[in-house]
């Protein structure tokens, strides 16, 4: 309806203005920042609770995922901020896995990617743990991903380009022998939506500003084996 109507007005030139709004939303004011901090603190508690639930070893991925909305509500959230990911073993190599009836086996990795909606603002956090046993390969990949995460986080300050933060983490993982196994952007902006406009990726040379809120989530995904994020 709108586009044909615009075509009828010859003397006017229309420009899409959504990017202007998106850029304003990239920077959060102090009140918004505090809400984001509170949302993330709640997410810390929920992640710990989910890890303890998984440690019992008697629930499927789906059964764990189905409990999450209630857990978030118990901690003051409206519910999930996105469809949760709880992925056991080889399922963790699919970074968009949807929970199924898979059960835990000793030596499985558990990728937990969850978030809650708190007073209109989203959290998003990923953690990887291992059930009962950890192989040398799993430990090495975990430590590599953690090294990349810490190095990227250490770069974050006003004036640093988002693409350079992405490159820092990607280079470290490549030095560890993995390139195509890190198959997504390093991070995304978070706020009232869990995925707001803007990426921490090679596609964005925007400089960091105080008040920006975004994720840093490097990963390595070994098909048929396990994933770490």
Region spans (language model):
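Active-site neighborhoods and metal-handling regions in enzymes and metal-associated proteins
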Residues: 1-229
